[in-house]
UniProtKB/Swiss-Prot annotation:
It is a multi-pass membrane protein. It is found in: Membrane. The keyword Lipoprotein does not apply. Keywords: Fatty acid biosynthesis, Fatty acid metabolism, Lipid biosynthesis, Lipid metabolism, Membrane, Transferase, Transmembrane, Transmembrane helix. It comes from Caenorhabditis elegans. GO terms for molecular function: fatty acid elongase activity. Residues 1-23, 83-105, 151-156, 209-227 are extracellular. It comes from the Eukaryota. Expressed in the gut and unidentified head cells. Its EC number is 2.3.1.-. Coiled coil: none annotated. This is Long chain fatty acid elongase 5. One of its GO terms (biological process) is methyl-branched fatty acid biosynthetic process.
Amino acid sequence: MMDQILGTNFTYEGAKEVARGLEGFSAKLAVGYIATIFGLKYYMKDRKAFDLSTPLNIWNGILSTFSLLGFLFTFPTLLSVIRKDGFSHTYSHVSELYTDSTSGYWIFLWVISKIPELLDTVFIVLRKRPLIFMHWYHHALTGYYALVCYHEDAVHMVWVVWMNYIIHAFMYGYYLLKSLKVPIPPSVAQAITTSQMVQFAVAIFAQVHVSYKHYVEGVEGLAYSFRGTAIGFFMLTTYFYLWIQFYKEHYLKNGGKKYNLAKDQAKTQTKKAN
């Protein structure tokens, strides 16, 4: 297992075996994750919030850097496959995106990274910040989806992976700057949320198209998994719905929560200056 995770002897087939072996653990981990965060939330109810500024800044910096590297190591291969074999080939056939020792390894790392990313929620709970359904739901589900799709060759996931990498590079960088009290306009957060919805829409399109090619056109030899596609379609459509609701609440309704908060903070700073 460790030779695949560390990349010392990476092979796509070997990495798939690791993912297959982790599937059952991931399902149990999701249940344990939900129980843990709500147990911690109850424990913290009458206790003072932890500051955790330094470890949080380090965490956000690590995830932003990791995500940027993941994008840089996968995107050139994605462009190469599109130029050589066409756009649909990326989500309908196993290509060097998955088998290449660099791109393939970083796609595998993305799959594995969904496990440590669960720590995001621990920071939220221990700092007594609002814990919304959208947050813990997507953390609980994504890891299992990633492992199933990876070892069953449901390669539509590549459009989740590389877009998620670049979005997370900006998102965790944004969190880091916010934690450091750097003033950032709400439009940046809005752009990140918009890009996440675009990511879901593109991945849903890839799933629908490869399913059409498989069932309607009867194309043989596709990298298609009914289970991976079913889990993915359920996951991505529910994410898309939740993110739309979040977008409306925070950026559109009554001026948008984030924009109103920014205005209030600007007024407070003006009063202090006077």
